[in-house]
Amino acid sequence: MPIYTKEGDKGYTSLSNNQKINKDSPIINFVGSLDELNAMLGVCAASLTEIDEEDFSTEVEVVQDIQRDLFIVGSIAVGAKLKFAAEKEVSNIEKTIDDYSRLLPKLKNFVLPGGDITAANLHLARTLVRKIERQAVALNSKSMEPFLPYLNRLSDLLFLMARYVNYKLKKQEIIWKT
């Protein structure tokens, strides 16, 4: 069976309930941004596995868990009857944030994204999460409410993971100066 269906050639796509919808609809933009984030996280995971100086297998696992969550969020957004344990996932992220926070030097200034390429890509992923969060709010839908705390914490987690990669690789954080 070919990957192409030709159904989208006229600017429409189908939701999981087979409802046809414009490809420029806010919900399709939201799901497209989730896909973009998922691909960026794939770049981050691949990059983490290429680092020889340190073992980042735990970070790869964290990233892949997030990728799985994003598929669920996107599926639910377009009508799939899946469950997402938002409170549990937020709690898991908060625990991971706390773990990284204990390992890192206290931050006293804003930092510019950069350092190691993997850290820079984690920062890029963080900005994609913020975009998705704004899109979820703009959808103004009850179905988005459980995802908002998850997305909010997720950007914090990716920020700390970027800092952690730089810290472990002894890359200097670039302090923002006015």
Task: Give short role names for the model-derived ranges.
Residues 1-178:
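Phosphate/pyrophosphate-binding loop motifs in nucleotide- or prenyl diphosphate-using proteins
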